A protein has these predicted regions:
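Short, small-residue-biased leader/transition segments that mark boundaries at the very start
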Residues: 1-7
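Conserved short alpha-helical segments that host acidic/polar catalytic motifs at enzyme active sites
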Residues: 17-191
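Basic polycationic patches enriched in arginine
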Residues: 8-14
């Protein structure tokens, strides 16, 4: 009975979303990790997205964003300090036709390639898990903006270990149809 109550309590807490001031939320946290914001402009005319990264290690802090065609990719700020590029050099933003993909890792390419071959956002992410950066097992966060009749919808996903246990990958996807003017959603790795 005790564990059942614990599960219900955790589910209840997870299902509650509250409005926040993103600036205040990030300012009050020493290390928010990586995050994605997707929403709709206040005038209702545009989709809006933002992505941020922070790093703990010298290798992770040694990166900058650069434009790459219709998207963005990371690159080493100082190539002589680059140690292991596999988790820090990637395209966080790619455009596939009229869809915009935003992620915190190389799963951007996975989503792009699978969707190019007719699979969905969720099907693409079923082929991936959290990052292999033991002991952190950093969650993979992803988002996609897709047009619909006269507007757009978006989805966000997080793939994470089971409270630090790499034996299990927990997959959460949140879909937002016809978003409200001036509102958005924020998904992050460590907050």
């Amino acid at each position: 009975v005790g564990s059942e109550m614990c599960i219900r309590d955790r589910l209840k807490r997870r299902s509650i979303m509250k409005k926040i001031d993103i600036y205040e939320e990030l300012k009050s946290n020493d290390y928010p990790g990586r995050g994605i914001v997707i929403g709709k402009s206040a005038d209702g005319k545009s989709a809006v997205t933002a992505y941020f990264i922070m790093g703990r290690s010298v290798n992770s802090r040694n990166r900058v964003f650069i434009e790459d065609g219709d998207g963005i990719r990371t690159q080493a700020f100082d190539p002589s300090k680059l140690e292991d590029p596999h988790l820090i050099i990637y395209a966080p933003v790619r455009v596939l036709g009229d869809k915009t993909i935003v992620t915190n890792g190389d799963q951007t390419d996975t989503i792009y390639e699978h969707m190019e071959n007719g699979q969905t956002f969720e099907q693409s992410l079923r082929t991936r898990e959290f990052e292999d950066d033991d002991p952190n097992f950093t969650p993979r966060i992803s988002g996609i903006i897709e047009p619909n009749k006269g507007g757009f919808d978006y989805s966000m996903s997080i793939l994470k270990s089971a409270d630090g246990n790499p034996q299990s990958c927990q997959r959460y996807t949140f879909s937002y149809n016809n978003p409200l003017d001036g509102e958005g959603h924020f998904i992050h790795t460590y907050m």
